[in-house]
């Protein structure tokens, strides 16, 4: 491993902090698929030391680590908070894969830092398992996301709403820099802002370094807005509600970042709110694209000392254009369509209105749309409380499919390739957590393996490919998760 490149930034961007180790910790799980992708040859003993925070002076030297807590600010539920930073996580260092891509190793649940405020800096088994599951589920679905490498846990109890077992997780991503880092840099002045812009371009957008120097900051802002728009489109298409889209939870490289009270849809509800702390619905499913552009406006304002007003406007326009194009593209793929037409947006929108009205299971509807017009199409119609209301839409869909150059077999295959047979529903995550809390981690490992290939049939998980019971649906969580 190597020391984090983040240390190249001015010292007011971080504090050096050692983790508060877990005592008698065990390695709960290792993401061997990710280990292979990273060409990572760390032993289980080494991973346990990293994941549990048991880093002695010798191990710090051997690993070549200088752990640090990052300082940033951000807008939380629309209000600026200047007192943010890594309150329970530490950037340990970075690993280079065989392509020399640097991957940051970040320890979530590392203990208190100067930015913990009144928190204890710890994480619990429930929350790290939820992050592990969600990041791997999104990765399997083709949605940009941070990843999870390993989990460690111990018998130490941490007080939340109840006492829960302490745990920690190694999060992996090329960078943990958030929109909030730029808000912090802007508050420090133009020199700090320019230093952060130059750092991000050098390490994460190197193609922009070829532009004239006075165009680079504006190009970076535009690129980040574009990636964020693409991410929003993908979230909407897979039925993912993040729940806490504060600007300090927005990745500068357009990845899903910081998993709390998230949810994948059971029944489709356009105004669904997964976070029961979000009483006003600011981060409801249908608000996510709007909040995405709102956060980009915050980012553009933070760039204000280094870009022109015209560059800010161009970046935000780029978000809107990118989102509109990407969203239709993602949804058309779910419908088995290979081309785009002007009427497709209405076809998609009208379908979602029907699904919302009848509370149709989101993932199962699109998966079973492959059966429309076939002997087993009743598997699709059984999802509908009033199938007759869908008939006009089905007719429009048939007409639209007829305009494609795809055979029926290819339409079906395109649908199956773009709609998962299994999805990480909240009740499934809760079952996995409950098993883990009594020492059974097999369901966790089995599900992570399955979530890496969600478009396959998985006959062993057939019971999870049916609509959940009323008791299993709509489980909401709070930010404490």
From Swiss-Prot:
Keywords: ATP-binding, Magnesium, Manganese, Metal-binding, Nucleotide-binding, Nucleotidyltransferase, Transferase
GO molecular function: AMPylase activity; ATP binding; magnesium ion binding
Disulphide bonds in the chain: none
Domain of life: Bacteria
Location of the active site: 248
Region (Disordered): 458-481
Positions of Mg(2+) binding: 249, 258
Function: Nucleotidyltransferase involved in the post-translational modification of proteins. It can catalyze the addition of adenosine monophosphate (AMP) or uridine monophosphate (UMP) to a protein, resulting in modifications known as AMPylation and UMPylation.
NCBIfam families: PRK00029.1
Family listed: Belongs to the SELO family.
Protein name: Protein nucleotidyltransferase YdiU
Species, as recorded: Hydrogenovibrio crunogenus (strain DSM 25203 / XCL-2) (Thiomicrospira crunogena)
UniProt lineage: Bacteria, Pseudomonadati, Pseudomonadota, Gammaproteobacteria, Thiotrichales
Gene coding for it: ydiU
């Amino acid at each position: 491993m190597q020391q984090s490149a983040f240390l190249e930034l001015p010292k007011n961007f971080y504090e050096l902090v050692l983790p508060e180790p877990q005592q008698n910790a065990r390695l709960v799980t290792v993401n061997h698929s990710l280990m292979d992708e990273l060409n990572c040859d760390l032993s289980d003993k080494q991973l346990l030391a990293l994941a549990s925070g048991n880093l002695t002076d010798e191990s710090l030297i051997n690993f070549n680590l200088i752990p640090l807590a990052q300082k940033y600010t951000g807008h939380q539920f629309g209000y600026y908070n200047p007192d943010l930073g890594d309150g329970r996580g530490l950037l340990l260092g970075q690993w280079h894969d065989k392509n020399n891509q640097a991957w940051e190793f970040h320890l979530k649940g590392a203990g208190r830092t100067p930015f913990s405020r009144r928190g204890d800096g710890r994480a619990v088994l429930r929350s790290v398992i939820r992050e592990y599951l969600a990041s791997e589920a999104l990765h399997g679905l083709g949605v940009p996301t941070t990843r999870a490498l390993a989990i460690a846990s111990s018998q130490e109890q941490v007080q939340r709403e109840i006492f829960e077992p302490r745990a920690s997780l190694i999060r992996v991503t090329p960078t943990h820099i958030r929109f909030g880092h730029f808000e912090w840099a802007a508050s420090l002045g133009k020199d700090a802002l320019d230093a952060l812009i130059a750092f991000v371009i050098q390490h994460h957008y190197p193609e922009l370094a070829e532009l004239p120097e006075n165009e680079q900051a504006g190009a970076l802002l535009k690129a980040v807005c574009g990636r964020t728009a693409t991410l929003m489109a993908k979230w909407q298409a897979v039925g993912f509600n993040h729940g806490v889209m504060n600007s300090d939870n927005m990745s500068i490289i357009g990845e899903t970042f910081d998993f709390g009270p998230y949810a994948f849809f059971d029944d489709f509800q356009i105004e669904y709110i997964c976070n029961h702390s979000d009483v006003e619905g600011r981060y409801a499913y249908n608000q996510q694209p709007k909040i995405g552009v709102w956060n980009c406006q915050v980012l553009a304002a933070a760039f204000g000392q280094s870009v022109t007003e015209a560059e800010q406007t161009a970046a935000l326009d780029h978000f809107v254009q990118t989102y509109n194009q990407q969203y239709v593209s993602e949804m058309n793929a779910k419908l088995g369509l290979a081309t785009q037409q002007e009427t497709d947006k209405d076809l998609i929108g009208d379908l979602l209105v029907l699904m919302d009205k009848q509370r149709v299971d989101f993932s199962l509807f699109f998966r079973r749309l492959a059966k429309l017009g076939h002997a087993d199409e009743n598997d699709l119609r059984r999802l509908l409380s009033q199938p007759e209301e869908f008939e006009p839409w089905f007719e429009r869909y048939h007409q639209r499919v007829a305009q494609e150059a795809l055979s029926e077999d290819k339409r079906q295959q395109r649908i199956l390739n773009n709609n998962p047979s299994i999805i990480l529903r909240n009740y499934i995550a809760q079952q996995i957590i409950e098993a883990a809390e009594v020492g059974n981690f097999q369901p966790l490992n089995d599900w992570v393996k399955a979530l890496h290939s969600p478009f396959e049939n998985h006959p062993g998980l057939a019971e999870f490919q049916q609509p959940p019971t009323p008791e299993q649906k709509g489980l909401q969580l709070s930010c404490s998760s």
